[in-house]
Amino acid sequence: ASPLRDVYKRQSIPLLGVLLFTIVPLVYMICIAFTNFDHNHLPPGSLFHWVGFSNFGNVLTGRMAGSFFPILTWTLIWAVFATVTNFFFGIVLALIINTKDLKFKKLWRTIFVITIAVPIFISLLIMKNLLAPGGPLNEMLMNFGLTNHPLPFLTNPTWAKVSIIIVNMWVGIPYTMLVSTSIIMNLPQEQLEAAEIDGASKFQIFKRITFPQILIIMTPTLIQQFIGNINNFNVIYLLTGGGPDNPNFYQAGSTDLLVTWLYKLTVSAKDYNLASVIGILIFTLSAVFSLLAYTRTSSYKEGAVK
């Protein structure tokens, strides 16, 4: 009984932490989604009460639908582009650095890894200042006569979305490059040499051997990155703050993701009920995609067979 009691004591503190900081806030958020707890019903001046599923109806089919679905669409577009570009260009960079004839391979790896060593919020704030209307990049372009006016990198909706994706590539590609490099360096050399002897081109070797090996190992990571990009608060908020403003959206800008919109609904608008609904929908979207995607991976199928 004594060893068992010791186990309970050791597990009680972590379980208490999970209860207080994960389960209780989650249950509280779910409950708030079924109330009218917003800026018009803030205790103690005004009490809120249960309203059932009306908040969900408001977001999905009511006046908030005009904001929710465009933001959801941009969130998914952003997540796809952010994940695919980092994966593709990370592999390309790894292949270039691992070319046999390339000199100073360690130096090139170190240069690209420096972006990982720098805290991401510092990189994003530097990029924000660099791309600002009066920033160094616009000043340089105008000094060289390439443009007569500052380019709207962060102030035009389309330019801002493209800029965000490019900046995210700068931050994320080195990580994919490192993982891909480790996979490439551990590929069976006998298999590669046999393919070369059989007359396979470099592209055929990449298509039939290298890329499938990278994809099998990195598929769970890609799923995780996609979900992470759906909830990528830092890149959007630190770079554009969700802007530029969009008069057609409620408390949201043209580059806001669902997660940054949720933040604004909570902190700025104090519409806690709507924010809770958005939080539940984000969780549902992420959970369903993760489950469907992971059950189709080779890792899951091999584990299921065993």
State where each predicted segment sits.
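A structural signal for multi-pass alpha-helical bundles of membrane permease subunits
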Residues: 5, 10-306
